[in-house]
């Protein structure tokens, strides 16, 4: 009888401890949620500034926010019409969340989904760096599947909307030392100065297998492939062609060049 009571008491104590612990864990998760959201926003702002060539490494959160607010303008783009839109608030709108909502996105036919993202949001957010009303840099969000993961990043274009000012990813799960070399500063530096379009205005940017021949007429559009990471390289090439194509920013860039965005 005594053993039975002891066992019951032990089980009750264990149950109470579990319940109390679960309450604390749930409470901590709720309490930390705003902080986690702020940190994600800060990381995103830091990435945008870096791609645009603004700021210095090691800036504090306050410095990042101040520089972002003073130099970067966020605007929402209607990808269907290729024009700026007031349909969404650029500060509160989340394109990635919208891409999962059938009411705010469209399913992509397999033949057109070269970036393997399945759905594309109808509105997205772009970022502009301007001086005295003149566009210096345009930052476009891009994403697509590599070998093991979806890569999320930004492509920065100079004011001519043809020359690459910066390119990089802020989130992915590619293999370190192979596909993970998309984070290598040397590889990212290869993109700066490359041009997206040829003399006829056709999209010509390309990641090639091996190294670019500097004497080639196509060298200005080409970037070295990642050694030992053919599928990641192909994935990056595909995602760029998707987002610069008709289902991405093609119409928007055309309108912006004409001053009609």
Swiss-Prot record:
Its cofactor is FMN. It is found in: Cell inner membrane. Keywords: Cell inner membrane, Cell membrane, Flavoprotein, FMN, Ion transport, Membrane, NAD, Phosphoprotein, Sodium, Sodium transport, Translocase, Transmembrane, Transmembrane helix, Transport, Ubiquinone. It catalyses: a ubiquinone + n Na(+)(in) + NADH + H(+) = a ubiquinol + n Na(+)(out) + NAD(+). One of its GO terms (biological process) is sodium ion transport. Its EC number is 7.2.1.1. Its main location: membrane. It is a single-pass membrane protein. The chain crosses the membrane at residues 11-31. GO terms for cellular component: plasma membrane. It is an enzyme of class 7 (translocase). The modification FMN phosphoryl threonine is found at residue 230. GO terms for molecular function: FMN binding; oxidoreductase activity, acting on NAD(P)H, quinone or similar compound as acceptor. NQR complex catalyzes the reduction of ubiquinone-1 to ubiquinol by two successive reactions, coupled with the transport of Na(+) ions from the cytoplasm to the periplasm. NqrA to NqrE are probably involved in the second step, the conversion of ubisemiquinone to ubiquinol. Composed of six subunits; NqrA, NqrB, NqrC, NqrD, NqrE and NqrF. This is Na(+)-translocating NADH-quinone reductase subunit C. It comes from Pseudomonas aeruginosa (strain ATCC 15692 / DSM 22644 / CIP 104116 / JCM 14847 / LMG 12228 / 1C / PRS 101 / PAO1). The lineage of its organism: Bacteria, Pseudomonadati, Pseudomonadota, Gammaproteobacteria, Pseudomonadales. The gene is nqrC.
């Amino acid at each position: 009888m005594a053993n039975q009571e002891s066992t019951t008491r032990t089980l009750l104590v264990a149950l109470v401890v579990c319940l109390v612990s679960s309450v604390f864990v749930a409470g901590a998760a709720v309490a930390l949620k705003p902080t986690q959201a702020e940190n994600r926003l800060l990381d995103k702002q830091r990435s945008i500034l870096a791609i645009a060539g603004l700021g210095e490494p090691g800036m504090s959160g306050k410095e990042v926010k101040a520089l972002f607010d003073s130099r970067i303008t966020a605007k929402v783009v209607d990808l269907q019409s290729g024009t700026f839109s007031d349909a969404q608030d650029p500060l509160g709108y989340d394109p990635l969340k919208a891409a999962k909502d059938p009411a705010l996105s469209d399913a992509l036919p397999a033949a057109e989904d070269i970036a393997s993202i399945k759905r594309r949001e109808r509105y997205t957010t772009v970022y502009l760096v301007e001086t005295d009303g003149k566009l210096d840099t345009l930052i476009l969000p891009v994403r697509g599947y590599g070998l093991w993961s979806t890569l999320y990043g930004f492509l920065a274009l100079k004011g001519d909307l043809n020359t690459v000012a910066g390119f990089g990813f802020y989130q992915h799960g590619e293999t370190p030392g192979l596909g993970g070399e998309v984070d290598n500063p040397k590889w990212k530096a290869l993109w700066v100065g490359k041009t997206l379009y040829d003399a006829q205005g056709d999209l010509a940017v390309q990641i090639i297998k091996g190294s670019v021949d500097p004497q080639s007429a196509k060298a200005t559009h080409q970037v070295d492939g990642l050694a030992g990471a053919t599928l990641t390289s192909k994935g990056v090439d595909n995602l760029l062609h998707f987002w610069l194509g008709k289902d991405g920013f093609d119409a928007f860039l055309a309108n912006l060049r004409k001053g009609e965005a």
